[in-house]
């Protein structure tokens, strides 16, 4: 997924240019936004990979809306309890824990992106931006360990907003 890697590289480049004194707030803001978009596209492109018509996958990925991903992420803990019941296997519980962390990180990243894009009163520090990028990378790594599981695929379906 070259696009996701490009977003991560762009975020890092914006946050830490060759000359740190050249870093401006706009660079920090765009770095936060790029980190968020890396994970947004990671999730939507993963869902689109399952679409049978290969040449239409880009259109399928565009069906996802930011607000629906946030809603699905906020609702995920309850959905996981419902789907797993009381007798979850250790492997399913580990997957659920990873997905729970992914959902929390996604919501936090979306809030950070909104702040970076719309809250002009906030000044970002390098450390804050670095933490956003690290959170996005942590989500990326976690997602790659669980993305092919039934629980993850259900989460992706929830992101479309259907019942």
Q: Can you name each region flagged by the protein language model?
A:
Residues 1-163:
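Terminal alpha-helical segments
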């Amino acid at each position: 997924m070259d696009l996701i890697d490009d977003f991560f590289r762009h975020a890092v480049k914006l946050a830490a240019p060759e000359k740190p004194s050249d870093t401006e707030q706009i660079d920090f803001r765009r770095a936060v936004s790029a980190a968020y978009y890396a994970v947004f596209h990671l999730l939507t492109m993963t869902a689109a990979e399952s679409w049978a018509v290969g040449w239409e996958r880009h259109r399928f990925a565009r069906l996802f809306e930011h607000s629906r991903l946030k809603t699905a992420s906020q609702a995920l803990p309850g959905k996981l309890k419902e789907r797993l019941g009381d007798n979850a296997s250790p492997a399913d519980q580990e997957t659920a824990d990873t997905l729970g962390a992914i959902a929390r990180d996604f919501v936090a990243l979306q809030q950070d992106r909104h702040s970076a894009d719309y809250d002009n009163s906030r000044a970002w520090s390098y450390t804050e931006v670095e933490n956003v990028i690290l959170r996005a990378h942590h989500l990326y790594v976690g997602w790659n360990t669980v993305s092919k599981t039934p629980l993850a695929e259900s989460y992706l379906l929830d992101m479309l907003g259907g019942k």
